[in-house]
């Protein structure tokens, strides 16, 4: 289903539109111990992400993007520094949604069952809710199909629906469209924009694709040489046409900044 036809409001179909969270990264340093000694990935990095914003972390392969995301996800411990999350309710533990390069679906479960699985200890989460999250990503005719019956793009939509279904104030996405062909990836970018705008979440999105970062984000952080060396606000109205003069002008500015580290 084309995202251009998917303008459903989350609340109107019974999907909760919860509070977005802020991310505070303070003086973050990460080193790995190797046989050759300490390998510095990045050092003394600080940035803040406002609630409800869409921020991309852009960098070349090996720049430390996934390491940064894993620290923010609490999968890795930093060498020093800290990451904090905040919402309007200080007593609420901030849940994090995750979307990976591969959707990691269980092939023996239907789409609905794959979503229900992450709610197995929540008696209030019903099949109807699982179906509504699938509706949000254009899979209303596929509830009881199995992942192997879907295309790669459709499987990734299930991964997105599953991540949003836990109502996370913060969504972390690690190059989720990098394994897809460009036509399918573009369809999913549009779907993601619709869902993000409907559900009011903070998104931190890792990519190596400059055009993708501009199309999606409010702000672009550029990681390289162990530091954040670029921090660009994206001043373009939504929806964004990647062939517009405004987009192409800003893309050139972003390219100049991105490759300035090589000068």
Predicted regions and their residues:
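Conserved signature/switch motifs of ABC ATPase nucleotide-binding domains
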Residues: 145-148, 166
């Amino acid at each position: 289903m084309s995202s251009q036809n998917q303008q459903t409001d989350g609340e109107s179909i019974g999907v909760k539109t919860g509070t977005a969270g802020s991310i505070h990264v303070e003086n973050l340093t990460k080193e790995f111990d190797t046989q050759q000694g300490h390998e510095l990935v990045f050092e003394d990095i600080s940035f803040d992400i406002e609630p409800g914003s869409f921020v991309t972390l852009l960098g070349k392969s090996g720049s430390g993007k996934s390491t940064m995301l894993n620290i923010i996800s609490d999968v890795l411990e930093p060498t020093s520094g800290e990451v904090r999350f905040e919402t309007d309710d200080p007593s609420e533990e901030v849940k994090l949604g995750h979307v990976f390069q591969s959707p990691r679906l269980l092939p023996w479960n239907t789409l609905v069952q794959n979503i229900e699985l992450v709610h197995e200890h929540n008696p209030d989460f019903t099949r109807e809710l699982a179906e509504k999250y699938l509706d949000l990503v254009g899979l209303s005719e596929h509830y009881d199909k199995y992942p192997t019956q879907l295309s790669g793009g459709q499987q990734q939509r299930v991964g997105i629906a599953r991540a949003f279904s836990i109502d996370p104030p913060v969504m972390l996405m690690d190059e989720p469209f990098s394994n897809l062909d460009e036509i399918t990836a573009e369809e999913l970018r549009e779907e993601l924009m619709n869902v993000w705008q409907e559900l009011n979440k903070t998104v931190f999105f890792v990519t190596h694709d400059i055009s993708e970062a501009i199309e999606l984000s409010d702000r672009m952080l550029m990681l390289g040489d162990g530091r954040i060396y670029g921090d660009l606000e994206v001043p373009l109205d939504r929806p964004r046409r990647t062939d517009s003069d405004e987009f192409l002008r800003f893309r050139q500015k972003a390219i100049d900044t991105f490759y300035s580290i090589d000068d």
